[in-house]
Amino acid sequence: MTEPRPQPSPREAVGPAYSIEAIRKAQAKSWEALHAVAAIVKPGMTEAQATAQGQAILAEMGLVRNWHPLLIRFGQNTLKIFSDRTPGDTVLGEDDIWFIDMGPVFEGHEGDVGATFATGTDPAKQACARDVKLLFDRIKAIWDGGKVSGYDLYDAAQAEAAALGWVLNLDIQGHRVGDYPHSVHQGGKLGGFGQAPSPGLWILEMQIRHPTEPFGAFYEDLLA
């Protein structure tokens, strides 16, 4: 007897224009944009200066819409989550850590990318920037491997982060994307999703912090 096919969750609803090919393309363009912005960020800049120059680069690339603003965080501000705001006057140091988070819209589909970089040679900050990507890759590999819920992904992430020597920030636990605007579907957090996340609909976010020092790292990408 054939088992009934599970019903799709309302939390994975999409609009009529959505296609997985289009969202993958939007994500690829978002990564291209992120690396273009990252290339201009240098020690001595303030967050506000880096953000303004980054926005100019995005405009030159033809970006006309974001579903969330460009965020660039330096130093201790890498501990802050998306909803936190900073005055913009923090200066990037010679031995420092920083990240970019951007949410552009390309051809009606939402990209969302984030990555961390380190300046200089500070070993702890270099390791933090490296390990947040390693953590992301390990958790994505769990998702790649089979039917694992969003709950389970973030349970695993907490354990993996601790094994690497970091503390996982569970105030952010991933979210939906889709054809713009995904917010109409009220998808909630990936870490609160009790089913296996479908490809092309969810952003896996990892934010870690040093257990005692005031800095952290961030990485996010599409599960697809």
Tell me what each language-model feature is.
Residues 1-224:
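Active-site neighborhoods and metal-handling regions in enzymes and metal-associated proteins
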